[in-house]
């Protein structure tokens, strides 16, 4: 079994998603022998955002590529191959200003690649990366799971929809809310999230 574990929080040891994503990954390794783990810390080792130069390589012969285009094309290919090869993904994705960290968006922009992870057909787009399980580890300072709060959720819903576009339908969410609403609520939310992790079908 191949596990791809991504963290995107910029908060290092103060991060709730890092703490919880580590528990998910450890739980998977405890339940299954021979788990091959690939880990990317997208905050400590950020992936460059797409630029005109990077995308321009698609419209030029490889012999004309710049050094940056060559290195970034190689990185994109590596990220896509990691994604395709993984049986399970654990994604630590905190809510920042109602959305995801920019570091995670950079990763998504590399792996959402036409012709590799999805394709366009006469009947619309088709995802090319099925048969994967994703555990999305979410943390929010406030509460956004209710009807009103969900109107400001461009975090979980976005990630789930992008993954679905790529063909991934098996997504489970581990959520810790009210992290910024006092130490008691923070502790309770983390405790409940860990209980939910123990019940995951991994």
Swiss-Prot record:
A molecular function (GO) held by this record is: FMN binding
Under Enzyme Commission nomenclature, its number is 1.6.5.-, 1.7.1.17
Q: How is the cofactor bound?
A: Binds 1 FMN per subunit.
Q: Which UniProt keywords apply?
A: Flavoprotein, FMN, NAD, Oxidoreductase
Residues binding FMN = 9, 95-98
Q: Signal sequence span per UniProt? A: none
The catalysed reaction is: 2 a quinone + NADH + H(+) = 2 a 1,4-benzosemiquinone + NAD(+); N,N-dimethyl-1,4-phenylenediamine + anthranilate + 2 NAD(+) = 2-(4-dimethylaminophenyl)diazenylbenzoate + 2 NADH + 2 H(+)
Q: Does the keyword NAD apply?
A: yes
| Top-rank taxon | Bacteria
From the record, give the cysteines joined by S-S bonds. Answer: none
- Cofactor(s) of this protein: FMN
Principal EC category: oxidoreductase
> What's this protein's family per the entry?
Belongs to the azoreductase type 1 family.
What's the stated role of this polypeptide?
Quinone reductase that provides resistance to thiol-specific stress caused by electrophilic quinones. Also exhibits azoreductase activity. Catalyzes the reductive cleavage of the azo bond in aromatic azo compounds to the corresponding amines.
Listed under subunit, the entry gives: Homodimer.
Q: What is this protein called?
A: FMN-dependent NADH:quinone oxidoreductase
Recorded source organism is Chromobacterium violaceum (strain ATCC 12472 / DSM 30191 / JCM 1249 / CCUG 213 / NBRC 12614 / NCIMB 9131 / NCTC 9757 / MK)
């Amino acid at each position: 079994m191949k596990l791809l574990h991504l963290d995107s929080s910029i908060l290092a040891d103060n991060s709730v998603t890092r703490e919880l994503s580590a528990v998910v990954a450890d739980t998977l390794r405890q339940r299954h022998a021979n788990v091959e783990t690939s880990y990317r810390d997208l905050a400590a080792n950020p992936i460059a955002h797409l630029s005109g130069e990077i995308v321009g390589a698609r419209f030029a012969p490889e012999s004309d590529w710049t050094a940056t285009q060559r290195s970034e094309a190689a990185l994109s290919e590596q990220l896509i191959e990691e994604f395709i090869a993984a049986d399970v993904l654990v994604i630590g994705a905190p809510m920042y200003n109602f959305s995801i960290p920019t570091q995670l968006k950079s990763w998504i922009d590399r792996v959402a690649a036409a012709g590799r992870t999805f394709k366009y057909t006469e009947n619309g787009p088709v995802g090319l990366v099925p048969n994967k399980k994703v555990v999305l580890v979410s943390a929010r300072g406030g509460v956004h799971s209710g009807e009103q709060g969900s109107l400001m959720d461009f975090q979980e819903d976005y990630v789930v929809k992008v993954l679905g576009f790529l063909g991934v339908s098996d997504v489970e969410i581990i959520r810790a809310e009210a992290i910024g609403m006092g130490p008691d609520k923070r502790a309770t939310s983390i405790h409940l999230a860990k209980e939910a992790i123990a019940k995951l079908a991994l």
